[in-house]
Structures are given as C-alpha cells and as structure tokens.
Amino acid sequence: MVKIAVIGAGVVGLSTALQVKQNFPFCSVTVVAEKFNTETTSDGAGGLFRPNFLTLSANPLESIKQWSQDTFSHFNNLFNSPEASDCGIALMSGFLLSNKEKLDMIEDISLGQSKMTAEQIAKMGFDCKHVTKVLTYTMECRRYMPWLTSKFLSLGGSMHHHRLKSLEELVGVYDVVVNCSGLGAKDLVPDPLVYPVKGQLIQVEAPWVKHFYFFEDDTYVIPNINRTSLGGIRIKNDYSTEVDPEISKSIWQRCTSRIPSLQKAKVLWEWAGLRPHRDPIRIEQDVMNFPKGTLKVVHNYGHGANGVSLSWGTAKHATRLVRQFLENDPELRSKL
C-alpha cells in the first residue's frame, strides 16, 4: 500500500489531506502535525472569500485565478448542499471600500458585484471615494476545520500528533509527503523565503451586523454564523503571538468609528497569530536528498492571509502533483 503523509493541519493541510484521500482511496493517508484545530493559524481567519491580489502579485495571475475559482466552486457546492449547516459556510453580501487602490474581486469568482455611485456612497455615510458591493461567501473555520477533519477520518484517513524536526524523519516511512507546514517550512525545508505576517482580531457578538466591510487599510468587519470578526493588522517579521492591547485598541477604534453600531457589541475573545507568507506561494514537486535516502515531496505553503480563499484550489493543484509522482514511478504505480 502506498503511504502518503500530509504535514500540517491548518485549513490548507486538511483540505489537501481530504482531496488526496478522496482521489486515492486505497492509499494510506496520514496528517502529521504539532498543532490541530484552535491551535492553528487558521482558527484566526476572518473567513471571507476574497483573494487579496495585492499580496499575491508574485504569483502568476492565471494560477491565482484557477486556485480562487476552484475554491469558490467548492464553497458554492457546499452552500448548496445539506452540508452547509455543519461546515460553517454562509452567503454574505458586503462592501469593499477604498480611496486609492481597487479592491474589486474578479467578477467570475463572485456571485455578483456592482459599483456604488457617489450619491449612494454619501447616503450610506461611507467616507471614501470607491465602494463596490459584492456577494460572496464567508467560512467559519471553527466549524469548517472540524468538518474537514471528520470527512477525512470517515474515508479512512488518520491523524498523528508529532512535531517534526526534519523531513528526513519521514524517509522510508512514507512514499510521498505533501508539505503544508506553513510557517514551519522556514526551518523544516528550510526555506528562507517564508516569513511571518502577524495578524490580530477581535471576535464580538453582533447579530445585527449582516454585511461585511473591507477597507483598504486592512480594517475589516466580517460576520460569520455565530460571531463577527473585527480586524486587523499586517506586521511583517513579527514573531509575537501575544495579543497586543494597543493593537486591539486600534482595531476597535477603526471598526467602531466606521461602523458605529458595533460600539455596544459584546467582546467574545481576541486572537493573534502568524500568517505564513511567501512570494510566491510554493506549490511544486521536490525530490529531497538526505543521508537516509530520498523523499518525494509536494510543497503547498506560503498562503499568508489567503489560506481560506485559496485552500481548496491549491489543495487540488497539490493533489495533481501527487498523482504525477504515483503514476510516473513504476514501483509506486504497482502498489496502487
């Protein structure tokens, strides 16, 4: 039997593990990770499907479009299925607001968008020049990640709690490894192009907020099913995972000044974490040589703040690369 390991249990790792198991049901597929569920960076995702093309500029546009479209199609299928209530997806309309930069999404990866006129912007009380109304999805990761895990395990996948110090540990144990280690890839590969971007948000109870708001200065308000996320920040090469009270104060001030109805919202909890960024995102095959032997690796990491928006699409891409490894190696092909 072919043995495949997926390193990492964030939204990218779990999406990849599920697709690999779905495509290769007779292979043994194991998720190997140090952190699971609420311990992962994905737990702090705002969850809005909105690929940020400004932070993805190092990637080929056609790749970004394909990853985005594949993820959007997956979310669309989930929303129109009985799984919707369990997986955390919601259909959401909202506003992209800016003075300088265009924050529009590509039209064919949203359910619709339209520019607001200056008169409409004034009536809404928005203090900006450009506003685009968008219909898209939000995904609540505290529901989605357990759902992905459950689906993966139901197909016969397995989980292994382990902190890897080197990929060499997997030589001779697994036939193919999919590396979705996020920021861990900086030391595990090692890859000097990976760096942390600190994010911080406040989760509040505000059931009266029914639309998302995304501003060009990384300020956002994103309602999910049971809570609303207020953010945010983007600090490169900051390794602190502690909630900074001054940053929280800034987030609260920015969000409540623009959406005054949030001023009496109940704070549920605060979160800070490190988003794993790389220019470009790394999705490719790699045959790594170690003293113990060689290891077939498919890399899939470096998504930064685009983990949720690109997760299913990059997982699909990585799964194709796994298939190439299996089909092009006579020994592995004979085990299928």
Curated annotation (Swiss-Prot):
Residues bound to FAD: 34-35, 41-42, 304, 308-309
A single BP term in Gene Ontology: D-amino acid catabolic process
TM segment ranges: none
Keywords, comma-separated and alphabetical: FAD, Flavoprotein, Oxidoreductase, Peroxisome
Primary location class: other
A cellular component term, taken from the record's GO annotations: peroxisomal matrix
One example GO MF annotation: D-aspartate oxidase activity
Position of sequence motif Microbody targeting signal: 334-336
Cellular localisation: Peroxisome matrix
Assembly mode: Monomer.
Leftover remarks: The enzyme is inactive in complex with 6-hydroxy-flavin adenine dinucleotide (6-OH-FAD); the complex is not physiologically relevant but an artifact of purification procedures.
Name of the molecule in the record: D-aspartate oxidase
